[in-house]
Amino acid sequence: MKIKATLERVPGGMMVIPLFLGTLINTLFPNAANTFGSFTGALLTGALPILAVFFVCMGATIDFKATPYILKKGGALWITKILIGVIVGVIGAKFLGEGMIKSGPFVGLSVLALVASMNDTNGGLYMALMGQFGKKEDVAAYSVMSLESGPFFTMVTLGVAGLSAFPWQMLVGAILPLIIGMILGNLDKELREFFGRAVPVLIPFFAFGLGAKMNLLDVWKAGLVGILVGVAVVVITGTALFIADRLTGGNGIAGLAAASTAGNAAAVPAVVASANHAYAPVAPAATAIVASSVIVTAFLVPIITAWWAKRIGVVNNNAA
């Protein structure tokens, strides 16, 4: 059975399918973690420790030595992505505060869901698209953009938006595993390769644990909102990133390729809620919305990027 290949055919499948399975188990057997305890209980409830390891491994893949082009390209896209998250967070906070919409067609929508969806780029998708329509330096620009990974900038954005702030210790704690990984990976290339191989392996495990804290009813309610948020991510961040790419000498393809939601962004609401319990009531719905945005952006971004590349006459590097 080609289970892995089947999962990979679904956009964000390594994140989304285990997330759904965890949610299904929690919906049908809500006391499973307590009933089985031991390692089974840890697998169902241990998403945060797995995420800590994930961010150490992710940090190890970030190279301090970047060429000026990589710094310029990656830095411009990274800063633009974060600024858009801040702007959306500030505007959203005026209407939603720390809570979420509890009825109507936008039920479950919160500032946390919006910011988490917009702050983090799907690195695998970006690098695959730039491998097709860009040059190797464009692919390498993700080494700078990957600094956006994790909950740190979402926490900062929520604080800037005037919502419940986080103690400095929590902010440091949110980014410390990434920094430790960066230091280790740059001190030893073999460690970088060793830890780097674990990044994709850990994704389905923390996704399953996150799903085990959710209910299918929450996912169902978040369906339409998640689709709308995904479209908003492509339109809003895509427009800003396209402009930033053009202003830094690009043709716009890199900007469009970065207008997505990372699979691991679905983990951010739970981490934020663990750091500040004011966000605990909105975290399950936010997780479902972000997961939906992962799928929607994974479908739309390649189509839009390929369309623009064709329009400006850029040849697919993978074409025969």
Swiss-Prot record:
GO cellular component: a single term: plasma membrane
Keywords tagged on the record: Cell membrane, Membrane, Sugar transport, Symport, Transmembrane, Transmembrane helix, Transport
Primary residence: membrane
Membrane-topology descriptor: Multi-pass membrane protein
Record field: catalytic activity: 2-dehydro-3-deoxy-D-gluconate(in) + H(+)(in) = 2-dehydro-3-deoxy-D-gluconate(out) + H(+)(out)
InterPro entries listed in its UniProt record: 2keto-3dGluconate_permease
GO molecular function, one term: 2-keto-3-deoxygluconate:proton symporter activity
Protein origin, superkingdom: Bacteria
Record field: transmembrane: 10-30, 42-62, 76-96, 98-118, 143-163, 165-185, 199-219, 224-244, 253-273, 288-308
Annotated compartments: Cell membrane
Protein family per UniProt: Belongs to the KdgT transporter family.
Function: Catalyzes the proton-dependent uptake of 2-keto-3-deoxygluconate (KDG) into the cell.
HAMAP family registered for this protein in UniProt: KdgT
Protein name (Swiss-Prot/TrEMBL): 2-keto-3-deoxygluconate permease
Organism for this UniProt entry: Carboxydothermus hydrogenoformans (strain ATCC BAA-161 / DSM 6008 / Z-2901)
Gene field: kdgT
